[in-house]
A protein has these predicted regions:
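Extracellular/periplasmic helix-loop-helix junction of adjacent transmembrane segments
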Residues: 27-56
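Juxtamembrane intracellular "pre-TM" segments in multi-pass secondary transporters
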Residues: 184-222, 246, 424
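Conserved MFS/SLC helix-loop-helix module at the cytosolic interface between two early adjacent transmembrane helices
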Residues: 56-92
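Helix-loop-helix hairpin linking two adjacent transmembrane segments in secondary transporters
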Residues: 135-185
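Multi-pass alpha-helical transporter architecture, strongest
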Residues: 176-181, 300-308, 391-424
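Cytoplasmic helix-loop-helix junction between adjacent transmembrane helices
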Residues: 100-140
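Helix-breaking motifs and short loop linkers at transmembrane-helix boundaries and internal kinks
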Residues: 36, 69, 90-96, 124, ...
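Extracytoplasmic gate region of multi-pass secondary transporters
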Residues: 24-25, 216-271, 327-331, 335, ...
Length: 424
């Protein structure tokens, strides 16, 4: 029961994590005109200041999480990002919004590597797909709740007050993390065997990570698939601008509608992705990424076609639902896979490295590149620049499909090979 209580609390923190992270995108139809931002500036704000600090700090935080008291580390991270979320509400322009995003990135970089390490020490391996899927239910629900806040409170409270409010909520939740105790780490049964913070142990963890990535094609292809999938996720930060400017919706109304879709479709995807990927791995000779291969292959046509249809079309709404469902399905299978392909002592580090590649490469290309692309298309007098940009980046993300296939195909062979490499 304690493991499930921990899982619920960490999922709640992850939900807040993505509410705060997504606020700029959810309030894009409020913030962009208020601050007079270009598409490139908006795309930059949603990624570069946050992602660079989030990704690089996350790698160090992953190493740190393998060595120190994890609930205390989580508490520090949540408090840090919440303070700067509140300060974002006072932004007067591009620079004053970019600066707090850097510190939000540092704070949020702590949560997932540390949480996944805690969960791996709390649940057996065969339930990690479920545990990771449940934890990552915070992603689509957080994105959806962020949109609901914009839709229901944006006009009445204003976007600035919403940032202040969420910062205060985060402070309370962050301090609550101190009520939890750290859990014994697997394969470390005594105080002497518990990892400690030192230069030598840090170097050894990094060497072990490099050795695992070099030895496992399944691990490499899982990481690569995630990067290409995150390119279209980065571009989707322009979704609300697309819906209002090129599909004619009212900004508050469409934020409410898509917010509810995100909550329920994403939550369903998390549960389905976690449970079915666990079943797939247990009952076939393939790894969890093969489940994502079939999911991506089957949903691809609608994922592109719905961009071109009228908003009163049934296909249009099915496309939005599938997008959030697929987002929900992604996290449980992939994060379980990357953790299971490395030694127990570097689980938090590999999660942090995976997050670094997803965000620093995938999201940055999708969001900032998407903004530059949309600005160029507007200057070239394209009739629907957001539509064309989103389609282009959706096509690029197709490369993730063969990567999922190869990762799923190689998973069980690589698991055996890595066991021999690390003598486990």
């Amino acid at each position: 029961m304690n493991a499930y209580r921990l899982l619920f609390f960490l999922t709640l923190l992850n939900l807040l994590n993505f509410v705060d992270r997504q606020l700029i995108a959810s309030f894009s139809n409020f913030i962009v005109p208020d601050l007079g931002l270009t598409n490139a500036q908006y795309g930059f704000l949603t990624t570069i200041p946050f992602i660079v600090f989030y990704s690089i700090a996350g790698l160090f935080m992953g190493v740190l999480a393998d060595m120190v008291n994890r609930p205390r580390l989580i508490a520090f991270g949540v408090v840090l990002w919440s303070v700067f979320t509140a300060l974002t509400g006072a932004a007067k322009g591009f620079i004053s919004m970019a600066l707090p995003r850097m510190f939000i990135g540092v704070g949020e970089s702590i949560l997932t590597p540390t949480s996944m390490s805690l969960l791996s020490d709390s649940f057996p391996s065969k339930k990690m797909g479920f545990a990771a899927g449940f934890y990552y239910m915070g992603v689509p629900i957080g994105v959806g709740v962020s949109l609901l806040i914009a839709g229901y409170l944006g006009e009445s409270l204003g976007w600035r007050n919403c940032f202040y409010l969420l910062g205060g909520i985060g402070l309370l939740l962050g301090l609550s993390a101190l009520l939890f105790k750290d859990r014994p780490r697997k394969n470390a049964n005594s105080a002497e065997e518990q990892p400690t913070l030192s230069k030598e142990s840090t170097v050894e963890i990094v060497k072990t990570l490099y050795k695992a990535i070099s030895a496992s094609s399944a691990l490499r292809f899982t990481i690569l698939a995630g990067v290409f999938y995150h390119i279209v996720l980065g571009a989707s930060g322009f979704e609300q601008l697309w819906l209002v400017q090129e599909r004619g919706f009212e900004r508050s109304n469409i934020a409410q509608i898509v917010g509810w879709i995100g909550v329920f479709a994403g939550m369903t995807g998390n549960l389905v992705g976690g449970i079915l990927s666990d079943w797939w791995q247990e009952n076939t000779d393939q790894g969890r990424p093969m489940f994502l291969f079939w999911l991506a292959l089957l949903t691809l046509p609608i994922g592109i076609y719905y961009r071109f249809v009228e908003p009163d079309s049934f296909i249009f709404w099915i496309g939005i639902v599938i997008g959030y469902f697929q987002l929900g399905c992604f996290f449980g299978p992939t994060f379980s896979t990357v953790q299971e392909l490395v030694p127990d002592r570097i689980r938090a580090t590999v999660v942090a490295f995976y997050i670094l590649t997803l965000n620093l490469i995938g999201l940055t290309i999708g969001s900032w590149g998407g903004g530059l692309c949309a600005d160029w298309m507007e200057a070239a007098n394209y009739q629907e620049p957001y539509t064309m940009m989103l389609v282009v980046f959706s096509v690029i993300s197709i490369i993730s499909i063969p990567c999922y296939y190869l990762a799923g195909k190689r998973y069980k062979q690589d698991k055996i090979v890595l066991g021999k490499v690390f003598n486990e």
